Curated annotation (Swiss-Prot):
Record protein name field: Large ribosomal subunit protein uL22
Organism lineage string: Bacteria, Pseudomonadati, Campylobacterota, Epsilonproteobacteria, Campylobacterales
Job of this protein: This protein binds specifically to 23S rRNA; its binding is stimulated by other ribosomal proteins, e.g. L4, L17, and L20. It is important during the early stages of 50S assembly. It makes multiple contacts with different domains of the 23S rRNA in the assembled 50S subunit and ribosome.
PANTHER family, A to Z: CHLOROPLAST 50S RIBOSOMAL PROTEIN L22-RELATED, LARGE RIBOSOMAL SUBUNIT PROTEIN UL22M
Region (Disordered): 102-122
Gene3D superfamilies, sorted: Ribosomal protein L22/L17 (3.90.470.10)
Keyword Ribosomal protein among record annotations: yes
Cysteine disulfide partners in this protein: none
UniProt keyword annotations, A-Z: Ribonucleoprotein, Ribosomal protein, RNA-binding, rRNA-binding
Presence of keyword RNA-binding: yes
CDD domains xref list: Ribosomal_L22 (cd00336)
Length: 122
């Protein structure tokens, strides 16, 4: 089992968790391929962290499974923007800590059509 951790990424944790939930339990190679075509900053970051976790354990991406994929909230950078009448309002720039754990395995996440065929006995 190998791990990779990327801290203080300028990325909203709520937006990154949407992508992280999709790849949990997937084959690492399949996850990297699907993240490559996801038009999202979080997908690019998660793809690199998954690849790093696979490399850290000297595993083959075809046989590696994503055991856990977690996105925790980091510190929030606070900035201000000038407004009318001499005022200023706050801007929050959230950061995240991305944690991916990969283990050796053979199973792949089943697609809906595969599950449907199994239920029908095909």
């Amino acid at each position: 089992m190998s791990k990779a951790l990327l801290k203080f990424v300028r990325l909203s944790p709520t937006k990154a968790r949407l992508i992280a939930r999709q790849i949990q339990g997937m084959n690492a190679e399949l996850a990297i391929a699907s993240l490559e075509f996801t038009p999202n900053k979080a997908a690019r970051v998660l793809s690199k962290v998954v690849a790093s976790a696979v490399a850290n354990g000297s595993l083959d991406a075809k046989s590696a499974l994503i055991v856990s994929c977690r996105v925790d909230a980091g510190p929030v950078l606070r900035r201000s923007i000038p407004r009318a009448k001499g005022r200023a309002t706050a801007i929050r720039k959230p950061t995240s800590h991305v944690f991916v754990e990969v283990a050796e395995g053979k199973e792949m996440k089943s697609s809906k059509s595969h599950k449907k065929n199994q239920a029908e006995g095909k």
